[in-house]
Amino acid sequence: MAAAAATMSKNRPNAAILGYPVTGSDVKGCCATAPDTISCVDKNTCPCFIFATRTDAVVPVMNSIRFMEALVQADISFESHIYSYGPHGFSTCDTSVQSGDTTISSRVPNWVSDSIGWLKEVFGDFGNGGMTKPVCKAHVTDNDGEFLSVDCTFGYVMGKPEGWKVVEGFLGGAGKQEKLEGQEAPQMTLEMISMASGMKLRQILEYAHMPEEVIEQVNDQLSMIPNQR
């Protein structure tokens, strides 16, 4: 149900914690009309915290893995913990729900404190009369943002003529050597460009030894370009 709320509901939660979830077609074994939530993951899916065990004999761990793959494809932030062994339905692993002789990794209970820490990263923490600023954004990159930025992927900006023109103005064009602050920027071959296409532009510029203040200048110019999708 949590996975369905995160991927399908009209009013979606701001974050979801999914424990050994049934997310794929296996759910049909429980209810013939139940949805396959993996296929419903989209850009509006909220950040997710997922935990499971490798040896779950009731819900195959591939439910969690394929759901995470869908989150990656949709650029959604998530944290996951797949522990080495343990039964299905371990809950918090407290003695009220698990007997002392249950065969389960001693680290499984960590998901409780880890998920709380993750929620603080997503929502912010309590401090000085208010909430601190979240450090984990809903999307890993800015590819779906209203405007371009250096936190879009390198390949995405390359595909936007206006955006790439800005970057070229600072780098001097891919494949050329250029000095920045007395240092030579590394030459980018086609192979390197292909490999780097999924990296954030910010990371590429840092790799090229571009000073932070110059990176911010690039970002300022990109932020004036609407992200036409």
Name what the model sees in each region.
Residues 1-43:
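Primarily recognizes the serine-hydrolase "nucleophile elbow" in alpha/beta-hydrolase
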Residues 12-15, 45-47, 74-79:
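Loop/turn elements at helix/coil->beta-strand transitions in domains of secreted/extracellular proteins
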Residues 17-20, 51, 83-84:
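Alpha/beta-hydrolase-fold catalytic nucleophile elbow
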Residues 44, 49-52, 56:
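Short beta-strand/loop motif that positions the catalytic acidic residue
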Residues 54-57, 85-87:
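Acidic beta-to-alpha connecting loop that harbors the catalytic carboxylate
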Residues 57-66:
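Conserved alpha/beta-hydrolase "acid-adjacent" motif
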Residues 72-141:
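C-terminal catalytic histidine-bearing segment of alpha/beta-hydrolase fold enzymes
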Residues 144-228:
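Compact, charge-rich alpha-helical regulatory domains located at protein termini
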